[in-house]
Amino acid sequence: MEEERRLRGRLSRRRPPAGGGPPNCRPWFLSEGSKSEPWAALLRSTVSGTADWTPNRQPLPPLPAFPSQESLPDPESTVPPEAFTVGSKTFSWTPLPPALRGSGSSRHLFCEPEGSLGSPTPSLKGCPALNSGRTPSAQECVPVQSPLALLSCPLCQKAFDPKLTQLDVDSHLAQCLAECTEDVVW
């Protein structure tokens, strides 16, 4: 009989543990404790499909921090929320914390030296926020456009007017590439 079961490939149910009672293997979010209760409520409302995200619903209590985040300072207390209006609605937004300063800064990836020519990245020379070390807002910095990287189309050799925007140049290049059947080395 045992060999017959193996040949058919049937699975058998596991035997209960030797303790005699049901095993105590509750998921972590159902275990007793004040830290896990908000997570359990969030999970229950999501899994059951009864999550009601309308403004009239009582909000869930704040979720506890993960152990790796407990030692970090609270970013909400250091950065005030900003408000912006779209149409007739006003939204609040908490900006991201400022980037860490030091050798790992990625600012050098986007800013070319002042003397570099042909850089497609706009220069932010006139931005006082970057000089002071804080995050600039959209109103503070107006990018200064660098000269065009291409003076003429490499496909049709048409000279680009200096008054053309980068979008116009890109549009022309895309049109020429779409019509071209030859390989071009840039």
Curated annotation (Swiss-Prot):
Residues 1-30, 50-90 are annotated as: Disordered. The modification Phosphoserine is found at residue 119. One of its GO terms (cellular component) is chromosome. Zn(2+) binds at residues 153, 156, 172, 176. It holds the Pfam family UBZ_FAAP20. GO terms for molecular function: K63-linked polyubiquitin modification-dependent protein binding; polyubiquitin modification-dependent protein binding; ubiquitin binding; ubiquitin-modified protein reader activity; zinc ion binding. A zinc finger (UBZ2-type) spans 150-186. GO terms for biological process: DNA damage response; interstrand cross-link repair; translesion synthesis. Residues 7-16 have a biased composition (Basic residues). InterPro entries: FA_core_complex_assoc, FANCA_interact, UBZ2_FAAP20. Disulfide bonds: none annotated. Keywords: Chromosome, DNA damage, DNA repair, Metal-binding, Nucleus, Phosphoprotein, Zinc, Zinc-finger. It is found in: Nucleus; Chromosome. The UBZ2-type zinc finger binds both 'Lys-48'- and 'Lys-63'-linked polyubiquitin with preference for 'Lys-63'-linked polyubiquitin. Component of the Fanconi anemia (FA) complex required to recruit the FA complex to DNA interstrand cross-links (ICLs) and promote ICLs repair. Following DNA damage recognizes and binds 'Lys-63'-linked ubiquitin generated by RNF8 at ICLs and recruits other components of the FA complex. Promotes translesion synthesis via interaction with REV1. Component of the Fanconi anemia (FA) complex. Interacts with FANCA; interaction is direct. Interacts with REV1. This is Fanconi anemia core complex-associated protein 20. It comes from Mus musculus.
